[in-house]
Amino acid sequence: MSSSSAASIGPPQPPPPPAPPEEEKKCLNSELWHACAGPLVCLPTVGTRVVYFPQGHSEQVAASTNKEVEGHIPNYPNLPAQLICQLHDVTMHADVETDEVYAQMTLQPLNPQEQNDAYLPAEMGIMSKQPTNYFCKTLTASDTSTHGGFSVPRRAAERVFPPLDFTQQPPAQELIARDIHDIEWKFRHIFRGQPKRHLLTTGWSVFVSAKRLVAGDSVLFIWNEKNQLLLGIRRASRPQTVMPSSVLSSDSMHIGLLAAAAHAAATNSRFTIFYNPRASPSEFVIPLSKYIKAVFHTRISVGMRFRMLFETEESSVRRYMGTITEVSDADPVRWPSSYWRSVKVGWDESTAGERPPRVSLWEIEPLTTFPMYPSLFPLRVKHPWYSGVASLHDDSNALMWLRGVAGEGGFQSLNFQSPGIGSWGQQRLHPSLLSSDHDQYQAVVAAAAASQSGGYLKQQFLHLQQPMQSPQEHCNLNPLLQQQILQQASQQQIINPDAQNIQTMLSPSAIQQQLQQLQQMQQVQNDQKQKIQPDQSYQVPTSAVLPSPTSLPSHLREKFGFSDPNANSSSFITSSSSDNMLDSSFLQGSSKAVDLSRFNQPVASEQQQQQAWKQKFMGSQSVSFGGSVLHNSPTSKDGSVENKIGRDVQNQSLFSPQVDSSSLLYNMVPNLTSNVSDGNLSTIPSGSTYLQNAMYGCLDDSSGLLQNTGENDPATRTFVKVYKSGSVGRSLDITRFSNYAELREELGQMFGIKGQLDDPDRSGWQLVFVDRENDVLLLGDDPWESFVNSVWYIKILSPEDVHKMGKQGNDPRYLS
């Protein structure tokens, strides 16, 4: 050859690499070959070490011939279950008749001495070079009809095909596409019909007939970097009705591949194999580095959860979830101690019948190995960051993180992700919440439960709510409201199991007496001159007869304002709030008043309480206080109540102190998104993302603080926030898309990384999302509909972000 003669001229030079066959130069396009092979195909790099599995090679023969390995095929005891080989050559081919792609590999087993030599692992392999500008469509019956044409999706035609000239009527052009064998095919691309659509007409039926395409096969159109249109096909796997003659020699094929591998292992000679990615159930030539990582550096056990990539329709990829049920040899008789399909699994979804019952270690991704660290997301996590600081979700003591533990700084020591949140929280949270008064509150409750009168508690509530009262709101009580309260009270029953004091149903006469006392109290309260706007009126029905804390210590009685031991029963309290919702008076009063939950009196469900508090702080101006749902009732100019009390009160006790201060604060802080006056926002800079931190959850910027509750309700919101390091977060309407491929494409264009998100394994970029339970998951794990219903935020991780998270994997603060 010319290369050898050239090498003999001049000074000695290292011999050049052998030239590839001439037919490969003109026939195959690597990008098109990989696109036809599939998005999960990985060819090892020439010159690297690989692991060859004869057992997997036999599976490919069985799948190709539709005949399993029979027991009479001789076994080769000297052939190990896995051979460590040197990969000398990889050549891509395509069948001339069917266009099926396959690869030819030349392997050479390593002797024990070579296996012990120092070896620097190369990359995991050449991932499938999937094109960035392409579309794949499964053919329908009309697409394969000789009288019709090929219907192209609108977005696919606009993205892949050259633009049409819409000044023509109808718009049309001629397309020239090259297939895997470099043969040109001409099609007429036209935009017509009712409704109008993109069609390939002239030339399409010729292509279908020549390739013998049927419904279920797939075609791919690729617009490459050289501005060329490439065309490929994928045959649908279908059972063979007429067995080809090769079935008769299938046993010989099994024997032949085993004999060739055994001979090569014994003599350390080269041997050749063929890998068909569309027919083989799994890859049976694995890069050595990938094999070592999976076998020796991944811990698995029965019961462990995992995910696994599968190719879906139209060249998309999806992860399916499953559970490891057994770790054992797939064929302990013929292939003992083999890692091939050594993991028996159970799949989550009903489509598990299409998934293999056994997989190999390098095919799965245990959930514990993927780094999911909310430090990169401005989001709340479920578990505590420090071992001594309880989580916000810790129902046993949800205020622990505010008070600090074991000498730590508590609230001040938390490392907030958003600038300024620490100072904002310190300004708005009253110091009483940062102290350990829990035992003292318990003493108040215990003393009250042991007595017979509720006067002290009534006065305490009045004392706490005085800064929020308005004289104009106490003047008139709508007769309709009085009648409704009477009807509701006749259906209520207040029970105190802790103090063993049972109050029977209140009679109408008792309610009437309490209303009279209410009017007298309102007259007294009118004398209190306070400069508070009456724009937000929260009405609290409180007719519970609570015991009096006669045994309360004097210092506690003074601390909590129980100055009159002879105070009478409680009545109907009306208050308003125009001050800051997190003002010290409000939080101090709320924290002390609502801690009466130890009475365990029957109340509305927790869901009703949370919904009521959510409505108060997110725009509907209603509040759950003492277990009752209290709706804001706008007042007219004369002070009369215009609206009825909310329907949620009907099934609740008129006063039921069953709200825990911890749950109150938990439901209050994350939903502080609206109903805040302009004056209360003076300390919050415009355009800031103040509440984007791991404790409060991720709220939008200052404009989002004034949004309506309907826009922020998880059940109704369709816009999600997308974050990427170094870029401004953006909102995206998730309902615009119908699958993951469209979403990835849009995100790539939105952040200027087009094509990087289509193949995370090749590019290193990862897409993760946070669901409404604050779990961080890989995007693509769940069915599309489930993802749309559960997604809350999306995070784009660069390869640097993923690498950085891997280094922080042992830090408990980053565990989710």
Curated annotation (Swiss-Prot):
Q: One biological process GO term for this chain?
A: auxin-activated signaling pathway
**Pfam families annotated for this entry?**
ARF_AD, AUX_IAA, B3
Q: Molecular function terms in GO for this entry?
A: DNA binding
Q: Which GO terms describe its cellular component?
A: nucleus
Q: Bias category Low complexity: which stretches? A: 1-10
Q: Where is the composition biased (Pro residues)?
A: 11-20
Superkingdom to which the source organism belongs: Eukaryota
| Main localization category | nucleus
Where are the stretches annotated Disordered?
Answer: 1-24, 526-565
Ranges annotated as DNA-binding = 135-237
Q: Subunit info?
A: Homodimers and heterodimers.
Q: What does this protein do?
A: Auxin response factors (ARFs) are transcriptional factors that bind specifically to the DNA sequence 5'-TGTCTC-3' found in the auxin-responsive promoter elements (AuxREs).
Task: Give the UniProt family note.
Answer: Belongs to the ARF family.
Protein's name in the database: Auxin response factor 12
Gene it is expressed from: ARF12
